[in-house]
Amino acid sequence: MSQNAAVYWGTGRRKCAIARVRLVPGSGELVINGRPGDEYLHFRQPLMSLAKAPLETLGLENQYNIIVNASGGGVAGQAGAIRLGIARALCELSPDNRRPLKVEGYLSRDPRAKERRKYGLKKARKAPQFSKR
């Protein structure tokens, strides 16, 4: 990578996962925590296509290398965080990219997270068995 190459940053979060994404002009490689993307995502094609969806929407799959530092959560949560990070980096790349990404919903952070456990219950909503007598 040359010193004057343009680098675009984006941060994505999903559940407990956080992904810091760098877009660098290149051949379309995805590297997550120093490992190839398909290997890191356990060769699960739906997660791979989920993570690269913003690039496919804009037709830029083979124009940028994606370097990701992901932490927290599980593999699926990290894939969702990577998707949001890539979308935000693409908005930084060009403001014209914002509209198609917004229409597809790639710029919205998914607020769903694990609900906390309440005292008196076994799980977040599961109550102990009720006995009438």
From Swiss-Prot:
Entry's Gene Ontology BP terms: translation
Record key words, sorted: Ribonucleoprotein, Ribosomal protein
Keyword flag Ribonucleoprotein: yes
Basic residues bias locations: 114-133
InterPro entries named among the record's database cross-references: Ribosomal_Su5_D2-typ_SF (IPR020568), Ribosomal_uS9 (IPR000754), Ribosomal_uS9_bac/plastid (IPR023035), Ribosomal_uS9_CS (IPR020574), Ribsml_uS5_D2-typ_fold_subgr (IPR014721)
Top-rank taxon, per record: Bacteria
Comp. bias regions, Basic and acidic residues: 102-113
GO MF assignments: RNA binding; structural constituent of ribosome
Keyword Ribonucleoprotein appears in the UniProt entry: yes
Pfam families: Ribosomal_S9 (PF00380)
Protein name: Small ribosomal subunit protein uS9
Source species: Gloeobacter violaceus (strain ATCC 29082 / PCC 7421)
High-level lineage: Bacteria, Bacillati, Cyanobacteriota, Cyanophyceae, Gloeobacterales
